[in-house]
């Protein structure tokens, strides 16, 4: 007699299947970044290649539920529990070593960033360095409701580090220092170096008290107004510190949350695994660059009849702002340590080419993980911020719709052993 199987809904199973190692509702362990977490299987795609499971991480918000390939899921048994504890212990030891290095590590990271961008001297080399690199900051966990605003131009109170000036680049504004990236359970870590390490993915940095210069995201319906003064009129000062916000202004600042679609989250994990664990690199120049993706999205919006002339202008301004952010942030905030040697080589070979014309979709996706924290320092009023986030979310939907084109794992290439030795 043939076995009667339950009907499939939307090509995934809600029961058991002979081709799967895990069943729905099973308690499992699952890799997320460098660590292993307790999880539960909610749904299964037995027909996928490889088989995929829809995972809920125990104790995490359901926003982190995601489809993962079978090779990231482990049976919940004593051996794997010990493996999980050992990885957590190793990660904790690394954190302690990093804390002991203190300012010496920060200076080393700053030197590495300067060397990686030193192929062309900056026109603003005489400008003063930002106090953000030397002033302690107060961090706050990422993630709260986004708020927004009216009209004006983007202004920030800053004496930020000057960045390398390059021909055809739209911005020479400085990149901010960031908090140590990590997995969702690592939100309480102290701020550290801006560079993304091998063991940690590029996620949103924590909020700081320092206002810093950033590219603007403006348009007919996306604009900004100046930040309030850092000192009150009733308390005059002879030498005001424009780069330091008042306690009231800092407390009133609202973090901006950009929701990454579930369909794109697993590409971030696959990206991390390919670079950090498998020691692969994304081929450069990318087959489809950030600039080309931006142009394709604009062409797509123009083809829609409901896109008015004014909306088209606003979309174009938002895309220009995203590209500016990408060019400014890539070198210091969007790279894994293993990619830095490749980055330095690219900077030597293409000193006058914008990074948005060299790097592609995977690095662009990393940008959106951090972009919310960057926008928290803008002076956008409620309506303007809402308009901006609407455009950003629509752009992410465009990436989802074309994910099979933009996020192919065939874009990753193997490197020779010499590169691996030098990168480590």
From Swiss-Prot:
Q: Where in the cell is it found?
A: Nucleus
> Residue spans with biased composition (Basic residues)?
97-106
Gene3D superfamilies in the record = 2.30.30.140, MRG domain
Give the sites modified to Phosphoserine: 119, 211
Q: Which GO terms describe its cellular component?
A: histone acetyltransferase complex; histone methyltransferase complex; NuA4 histone acetyltransferase complex; nucleus
Region described as Disordered: spans on this chain: 88-243
InterPro entries, per database record: Chromo-like_dom_sf (IPR016197), Chromo/chromo_shadow_dom (IPR000953), MRG (IPR008676), MRG_C_sf (IPR038217), MRG_dom (IPR026541), Tudor-knot (IPR025995)
Instruction: Give the MRG domain ranges.
Output: 252-424
SMART domains from the xrefs? CHROMO (SM00298)
Q: Which residues carry this modification: Phosphothreonine?
A: 175, 183, 196-197, 235
Question: Could you give the subunit structure recorded for this chain?
Answer: Component of the Tip60 chromatin-remodeling complex which contains the catalytic subunit Tip60 and the subunits Domino, Tra1, Brd8, E(Pc), DMAP1, Pontin, Reptin, Ing3, Act87E, BAP55, Mrg15, MrgBP, Gas41 and YL-1.
Function per UniProt: Part of the Tip60 chromatin-remodeling complex which is involved in DNA repair. Upon induction of DNA double-strand breaks, this complex acetylates phosphorylated H2AV in nucleosomes and exchanges it with unmodified H2AV.
What name is this protein filed under? NuA4 complex subunit EAF3 homolog
Question: Species name for this entry?
Answer: Drosophila melanogaster
Q: Which gene encodes it?
A: MRG15
């Amino acid at each position: 007699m043939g076995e009667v199987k339950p009907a499939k809904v939307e090509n995934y199973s809600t029961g058991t299947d002979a081709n799967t190692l895990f069943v729905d509702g099973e308690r499992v362990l699952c890799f997320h970044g460098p660590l292993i977490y307790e999880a539960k299987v909610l749904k299964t795609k037995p027909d996928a290649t490889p088989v995929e499971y829809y995972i809920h991480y125990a104790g995490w918000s359901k926003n982190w539920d995601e489809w993962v390939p079978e090779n990231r899921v482990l049976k919940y048994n004593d051996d794997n529990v010990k493996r999980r504890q050992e990885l957590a212990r190793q990660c904790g030891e690394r954190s302690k070593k990093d804390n002991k290095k203190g300012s010496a590590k920060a200076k080393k990271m700053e030197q590495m960033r300067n060397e990686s961008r030193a192929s062309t001297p900056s026109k603003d080399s005489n400008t003063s360095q930002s106090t953000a690199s030397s002033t302690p900051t107060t961090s706050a966990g990422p993630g709260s409701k986004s708020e927004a605003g009216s009209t004006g131009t983007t202004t920030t109170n800053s004496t930020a580090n000057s960045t390398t000036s390059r021909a055809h680049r739209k911005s020479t504004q400085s990149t901010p220092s960031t908090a140590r990236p990590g997995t969702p359970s690592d939100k309480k870590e102290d701020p550290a170096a801006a560079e993304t390490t091998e063991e940690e993915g590029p996620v949103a940095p924590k909020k700081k008290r320092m206002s810093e210069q950033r590219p603007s995201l403006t348009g007919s319906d996306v604009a900004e107004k100046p930040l309030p003064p850092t000192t009150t009129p009733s308390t005059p000062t002879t030498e005001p510190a424009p780069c330091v916000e008042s306690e009231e202004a800092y407390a009133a600042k609202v973090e901006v949350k950009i929701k990454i679609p579930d369909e794109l989250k697993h590409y971030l994990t696959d990206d991390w695994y390919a670079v950090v664990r498998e020691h692969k690199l994304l081929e450069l120049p990318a087959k489809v660059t950030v600039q080309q993706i931006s142009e394709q999205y604009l062409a797509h919006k123009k083809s829609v009849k409901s896109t008015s002339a004014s909306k088209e202008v606003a979309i174009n301004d938002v895309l220009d702002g995203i590209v500016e952010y990408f060019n400014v942030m890539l070198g210091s905030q969007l790279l894994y340590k293993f990619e830095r040697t490749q980055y330095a080589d690219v900077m030597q070979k293409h000193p006058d080419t914008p990074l948005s014309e060299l790097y592609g979709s995977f690095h662009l996706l990393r940008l959106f993980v951090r972009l919310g924290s960057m926008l928290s320092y803008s002076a956008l009023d409620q309506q303007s911020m809402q308009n901006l986030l609407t455009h950003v979310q629509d752009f992410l939907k465009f990436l989802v719709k074309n994910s099979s084109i933009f996020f192919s794992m065939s874009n990753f290439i193997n490197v020779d052993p010499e590169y691996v030795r030098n990168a480590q």
